[in-house]
Regions:
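Surface-exposed amphipathic alpha-helical segments
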Residues: 1-3, 168-199
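Short acidic, Gly/Pro-enriched loop/turn segments at secondary-structure junctions
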Residues: 2-13
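Short beta-strand-to-coil "C-cap" segments at the C-terminal boundary of structured domains/repeats
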Residues: 6, 43-48, 196-199
Length: 199
């Protein structure tokens, strides 16, 4: 479980760096192959949007989005526009995303103006699912999942993430379930059912 703990801490460090507060839950289960564990992170979307969107506070699109978050409802036309825009950003083939890259520093010598980090960190996104509405939920809910490979130098950690955006009026929440890729088949139905039954 050392590997899982380490990769979970790295995922949470990203949220910490962004200044986003979150709740975290540990899920445990067992089957014939042994003990299983996963993390479930819950982010208050309204609070995060206000924190990250300070510059856009007067932007009409930002105001409209915040109003939708308050109402807990997105009309069908806006939903199609949003899903279209979001899904265009989701890689359709295996994609490597650099998490840290060259650092630009001021220098008279252009050869020395870039410093490469000692350890390159990347996240490979594979089999990413399009964001889609979830039927049979109390609140409007959208979900997506993906297999991920987190690489930190020579260490690679295969992960699985399953996310749901639940539009609870006044308190919309983004839930992200994270587990190791080998536990994906065990946790996928658990995550899916949990996201459907949020009250």
């Amino acid at each position: 479980h050392q590997m899982t703990r380490q990769s979970n801490q790295q995922a949470l460090a990203i949220l910490d760096q962004m200044g986003i507060s979150y709740d975290i839950y540990q899920l445990q289960g067992e089957d014939k192959s042994g003990q299983k564990d996963a993390l479930l992170v819950a982010v208050d979307v309204k609070e995060a949007a206000q924190h990250l969107g300070k510059k856009e506070a007067n932007d009409p699109m930002f105001i409209a989005a915040m109003t939708a978050l308050d109402k807990g409802q997105i009309d069908p036309v806006t939903e199609q526009l949003l899903l279209g825009t979001i899904n265009k950003q989701i890689p359709t083939s295996t994609t490597v995303v650099p998490l840290n890259g060259p650092i630009n520093v001021s220098s008279r010598d252009p050869q020395k103006a870039t410093i490469m980090p000692k350890t390159l960190r990347t996240l490979t996104v594979e089999n990413a699912e399009q964001v889609h509405p979830v039927a049979g939920t109390k609140y409007q809910t959208y979900a997506a999942s993906s297999r991920l490979l987190y690489a930190d130098g020579n260490v690679q950690t295969p992960l699985y993430a399953n996310a749901a955006f639940v539009l609870k009026p006044g308190k919309p929440v983004l839930y992200v379930g994270i587990t190791t890729d080998v536990q994906r088949d065990y946790f996928k139905p658990i995550f899916d059912n949990a996201f459907k039954s949020i009250k």
